[in-house]
Amino acid sequence: MKVTIIAGARPNFMKIAPLMRAIKAAKAAGKNITARLVYTGSDEDKSLEPSLFTDLDMPRPDVYLHVDNTDFFQRMAGILVAFARELEQHPAQVVLVVDDLTPTMACSIVAKKKGIKVAHLVAGTRSFDMDMPKEVNSMITDGLSDYLFTAGMVANRNLNQTGTEQAHVHFVGNILIDTLRYNRTRLQRPVAFSIMGLKEKEYLLLTLNKHSLLNNDTALKAIFRTILEKTDKPIVAPLHTYVKNKLSVLDITSERL
């Protein structure tokens, strides 16, 4: 079996790594299976530093489609054309896509148009907010998929409510846990934690990346006000530069943040 696996952004590799190791093990055991890893972005993407693949114990992508437009429509069109060409040169029996990104949806459409089976890892995820681009991506990808791998029973229920045949739905659990377990013995305390004087179990970790939230000034202020009121622990927030600038404009500051 020839499987083409799609990665559209750095976070996808965290979920793909266990699959690559499993396929490698199956092949070593005599199974007739091969995997080709396709990254829709550029090989010069600075977020894909060599240590990422070393840490995840996985190979770098076999091919880069070099589509990195920020405009949705240009990116979508670029991936459709580039991935169609990729499948013509390297046919596959199954195309596996991850999460709910634009490349996820685009590659699903190409595969389906070419009569290739589509597998969706982390299927059935719903926000029920059609203003969120990822909601549209996820719904379209799920609708095109032949194999829907879910992380939880809520996802199974979501798919059932939209009329998905249950024979196509497979509950496999949260694959990120596989990555965490695999690397657990290799994890090291970040040097930055010592510099900041953080103690074990005595700090909060905050992530913030939903555009729908970042564009809602009232909600954003309320979240930080609530967090700062409810705890006196230091807050570690690895934020994108855009988010940092947003907080600065809104005058959201604290010695503990």
What are the functions of these language-model segments?
Residues 4-7, 14-22, 28, 52, ...:
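Active-site and donor-binding regions of nucleotide-sugar-utilizing enzymes
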Residues 5, 37-39, 120, 171, ...:
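Structural beta-sheet core signal
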Residues 8-9, 39-42, 123, 174, ...:
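Cofactor-binding loop segments of dinucleotide-utilizing enzymes, especially the Rossmann-like FAD-
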Residues 12-16, 45-47:
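Short N-terminal binding/cap micro-motifs at the start of the first secondary-structure element
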Residues 25-36, 231-235:
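A generic structural motif
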Residues 31-75:
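Conserved nucleotide-sugar phosphate-binding/catalytic loop shared by glycosyltransferases and other
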Residues 42-43, 47, 66, 144-218:
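A nucleotide-sugar donor-handling region in carbohydrate enzymes
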Residues 50-53, 188-257:
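Donor-nucleotide binding loops and adjacent catalytic segments primarily
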